[in-house]
Amino acid sequence: MNILPVYKASFFLSQQREDGLKLRVIYAGDHVYTDFQIGEQFQSETDSLYNGILFGIMDVLMWYAILMQTKKICMTKKIDIEFLEPISCNVPYRAKSKLLNADEKDIHVTAWIEDNNGQVYSKVTALFREGRGMNASDIINNFDFSETTPEMKEFFDSFLE
């Protein structure tokens, strides 16, 4: 299990933010994932989790899926998302993401949220593009590596060379 480093200020990932989700992203070779169970503080008027929170989780995972496969810092350009079933509070789910394909300019990726039985509750496909003027070292220098392995730290240090 390879826990990925997190951006220290991330609402979704930081383990230090009291108001955040404190997700841990795991690198599994051909995909990334996170297990989560979110409480009522993010419950909508329909007694399910806000779709914006769900998209945010999938967007973060897509960013990591791209980073791990291409070593590129990318930004979301276009999304196609489906919310198939409501996601309940205080129930365990797993969100996954994997790279579909990448060429010189366009990077296509997908993510989805499923329950313990593999039923998919929401899914997204997206087009990402490499961020212009973005410096990988500026981002990576703001990562928290406290839960990563030395090998994962070494992988991310290779971005700085």
Where are these regions (language model features)?
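HotDog/MaoC-like acyl-thioester-processing domains
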Residues: 1-4, 87-89, 100-161
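Hydrophobic beta-strand-centered segment that forms part of the acyl-chain substrate-binding groove
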Residues: 60-94, 99-100, 125
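Non-catalytic linker/capping segments at the edges of enzyme domains
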Residues: 1-40, 140-161
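Short beta-strand micro-motifs enriched in acidic
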Residues: 26-28, 98-102
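Hydrophobic residues in beta-strands and at strand termini
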Residues: 36-38, 83, 130
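A conserved, well-ordered hydrophobic junction motif at loop->secondary-structure transitions
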Residues: 33, 38-57
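Short coil/loop residues immediately preceding or within conserved phosphate-binding loops
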Residues: 20, 76-78, 108
